[in-house]
Amino acid sequence: MARPPPPDTPARRRKQAAHARGLAAEDRAAAVLEAQSFRILARRLRTSAGELDLVARRDDLLVFCEVKLRRSLAEAAESLQLRQRRRIIAAAELFLADHPELAPLAMRFDAILLGRDGGAEHLEGAFELEG
């Protein structure tokens, strides 16, 4: 027997709106990478360590990209904390374990910062493995 849908509450509507903003932000970030000749290999990839927003490849370079949308680019930059960087690195390691053919590629951890005002900044090498 199917469960009835959850009640429509203000909290649920906020969560749905945040989810939609996140998807739109990831679309914008993917477009930034594609404009730089990257091919998107994965979006919102869930692993046991956490989620990878975007995984992209250009030639012999594999990029794990975190997307941050905030009111301003400065707020977006501040939101990428050490704990999250470690989670992204762990998720990337799991991704590579599942895709050993990509392991020989050069690897980089980027961030694409997006402001709600439309601003965007691509931080290449935003953090390192030691992160």
From Swiss-Prot:
Q: Which domain of life is it from?
A: Bacteria
- Name one matching Pfam family: UPF0102
Q: Which molecular function GO terms apply here?
A: nucleic acid binding
Gene3D superfamilies under this entry?
A: 3.40.1350.10
Q: Membrane spanning segments where?
A: none
Return the InterPro entries for the record.
Restrct_endonuc-II-like (IPR011335), tRNA_endonuc-like_dom_sf (IPR011856), UPF0102_YraN-like (IPR003509)
Q: Which PANTHER family match?
A: UPF0102 PROTEIN YRAN (PTHR34039:SF1)
The text of the family note is: Belongs to the UPF0102 family.
Protein name as it appears in the record: UPF0102 protein AZC_4471
